[in-house]
């Protein structure tokens, strides 16, 4: 039998996970998100694949001159408190993004108003990484890829990026 405190923790984690899974992805194409700038892409593995909510699609760079910078926009300034990243895709694992940074801006990303939200290293498995942050507002998001799982990779790849807010449900 589980101690009461562990049982309570399991129940809380289950409900939070269930609620997060049902949270709307604010940056997805279905929600009006757009890919607005990128340093490179290799057709058909284009930048918008990262926000299309289809795990089988992904982005691949044309070459591996780092950093790769991918910029996305929401239809309007929105509140968010969770970010999700998936590097794993059908491309070679050594190409999967390793060191990334995500920044947000509103209203003028071209005027240097970027605020770094997260600077992190993704695991070699490429599995989904969800991070919770203090609630913020933003309209533009910049994903920078500084390294791949193997520094000798000839290209970089990334699967999915999500921006979520539990209060919007």
Regions found by a protein language model. Give the residues of each.
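Extracellular carbohydrate recognition and processing domains
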Residues: 112-134
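Bacterial N-terminal signal peptides that target proteins for export
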Residues: 1-8
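Short, surface-exposed beta-strand/strand-loop-strand elements in extracellular ectodomains
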Residues: 93-108
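Disordered, acidic Ser/Thr/Pro-rich linker "stalks" and the adjacent N-terminal cap
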Residues: 21-75, 88-95, 135, 151, ...
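Noncatalytic modules at the cell exterior or secretory-pathway interfaces
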Residues: 134-145
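A short beta-strand element within beta-rich, extracytoplasmic domains
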Residues: 79-91, 143
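Short beta-strand-plus-loop segments that form exposed binding edges in beta-rich domains
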Residues: 144-152
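Bacterial N-terminal signal peptides
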Residues: 8-16
């Amino acid at each position: 039998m589980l101690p009461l405190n562990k049982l309570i923790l399991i129940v809380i984690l289950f409900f939070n996970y269930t609620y997060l899974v049902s949270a709307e992805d604010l940056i997805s194409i279905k929600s009006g998100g757009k890919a607005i700038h990128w340093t490179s892409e290799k057709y058909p593995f284009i930048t918008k694949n990262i926000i299309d909510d289809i795990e089988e699609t992904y982005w691949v760079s044309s070459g591996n001159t780092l950093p790769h910078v991918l910029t996305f926009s929401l239809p309007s300034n929105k509140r968010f408190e969770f970010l999700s990243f998936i590097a794993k895709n059908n491309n070679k694992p050594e190409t999967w993004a390793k060191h990334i940074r995500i920044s947000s801006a509103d209203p003028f990303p071209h005027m240097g108003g970027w605020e770094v939200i997260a600077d992190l290293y993704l695991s070699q498995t490429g599995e989904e990484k969800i991070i919770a942050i203090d609630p913020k507002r933003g309209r533009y998001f910049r994903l920078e890829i500084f390294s791949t799982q193997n520094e000798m990779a000839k290209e970089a790849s990334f699967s999915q990026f999500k921006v979520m807010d539990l209060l919007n449900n």
